[in-house]
């Protein structure tokens, strides 16, 4: 499989050391240097290839790319859950050129914004021996919050907390 390049190994090592004492951090890398891959390798390292990860992105096209990349490059098979409003994306007005491609994205797993459906998928993957990754657009954060609230309530707080949250293109968040 794919092997990390030198600059990615340095980033992974720095992240490993940094997260021993911190619970938040930034990974800043130039375009085309493999941030998505590096984030996956950091997640696998920090969580010993097992845990619940939230991967946030600004657009559905980026969600599809990230999902495909993580599933292709993961050490152990990933259980992916996609949270986005496909219907809203496909009705996007073409003038919104920033995310024009959203309407033609084919996601590898069905997408939803229904909190009950999200909670059901999370429960289904609870004992998965690998990473369970919730891939979501920022605009769907409320659906994740509602699903997480439901699962934490059902499991008396024993399941549903994210072990790691990755915010891609975080500089675009408000």
Q: Each predicted region: which residue ranges?
A:
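Conserved two-lobed SF2 helicase motor
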Residues: 128-146
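Alpha-helical elements of the RecA-like P-loop NTPase motor core of helicases
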Residues: 13, 64, 143
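Conserved catalytic network of the ASCE P-loop NTPase/AAA+ motor domain
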Residues: 46-48, 74-75, 125-128, 156-159
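ATP-dependent helicase/translocase motor core
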Residues: 1-33, 37-51, 68-72, 92-113, ...
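Conserved helicase ATPase core of P-loop NTP-dependent helicases/translocases
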Residues: 117-123
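Loop/turn-to-beta-strand initiation segments
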Residues: 52, 130-133, 161-164
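SF2 helicase catalytic motif II
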Residues: 138-141, 153-174
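Conserved RecA-like ASCE P-loop NTPase motor core of nucleic-acid helicases/translocases
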Residues: 51-59
């Amino acid at each position: 499989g794919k092997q990390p390049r030198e600059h990615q190994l340095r980033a992974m090592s720095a992240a490993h050391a940094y997260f021993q004492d911190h619970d938040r951090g930034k990974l800043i890398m130039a375009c085309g240097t493999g941030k998505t891959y590096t984030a996956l390798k950091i997640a696998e390292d920090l969580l010993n290839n097992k845990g619940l990860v939230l991967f946030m992105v600004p657009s559905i096209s980026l969600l599809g790319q990230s999902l495909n990349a993580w599933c292709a490059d993961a050490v152990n098979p990933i259980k992916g859950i996609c949270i986005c409003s496909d219907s809203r994306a496909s009705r996007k007005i073409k003038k919104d050129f920033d995310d024009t491609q959203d309407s033609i994205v084919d996601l590898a797993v069905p997408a939803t914004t229904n909190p009950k459906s999200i909670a059901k998928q999370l429960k289904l993957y609870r004992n998965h021996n690998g990473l369970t990754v919730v891939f979501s657009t920022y605009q769907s954060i409320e659906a994740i919050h509602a699903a997480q609230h439901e699962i934490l309530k059902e499991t008396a707080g024993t399941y549903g907390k994210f072990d790691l949250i990755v915010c891609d293109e975080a500089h675009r968040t408000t």
